[in-house]
Amino acid sequence: PLRLPYMFFFPGTTSVLFEVGLCVATYLTVLFIEFSVAPMEWLSCKFPFLKKWRKVVVRCTIILTIFGVCLSTLHQSSLGALYLIAPGKLHPLWYSPFMPMFFFVSSMAAGCSMVIFEGMWAHKGVHHYMDETHLREADEVVFSFSKAGAFILFGYFMLKLIDMLVQANLPYLCTGYGLWWLVEMLFFVLTPALLYAKGSRDRNIKLCRFASANAVLG
């Protein structure tokens, strides 16, 4: 970890890993600025000059959110691109020239699932501090993310299936690694997609939360 700042002093501008590190560092900076609104609210009582800074950050919330989303999409696809240069280190069932796209799509599914999963535990722990508006709209947020998660996971499943067939990797399914690939696709991609779809349709909040735990575990 002590060598992480090296990339800023000796930048390898032709390296994918440099782009990943730069995006992650910038992304963490944006997150820190967004989060600074909360501590500045009570620190401004002792340090009045922080009130002006807090107002500036609050006004830029939408811009910071858009910037953060763009940065997260960049480094997710770049992580997939890292594996393109090491085909010998991955089994053919997982290696694909479309790995940057797979990383990006799977990160969207993981994001939806983590919002539901973390929100579930936050709601249990601190729901008595939340206002009535938040408590009333919390379930609708879960159902919205569940719908999105169902579409994204099913799309990811179809993309992986098509890629496996196009690259003629079907014979590998009869091997030990093929069994693990089927476990991943069926139990940790297709199953939560179906659970999300059923939970959002039937408005079953417990089923949606269980699906999020399943997807996060996968």
Regions of interest found by a model, annotated:
Residues 207-218:
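Central hydrophobic cores of alpha-helical transmembrane segments
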Residues 9-201:
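Long, contiguous internal "core" modules enriched in hydrophobic/ aromatic residues
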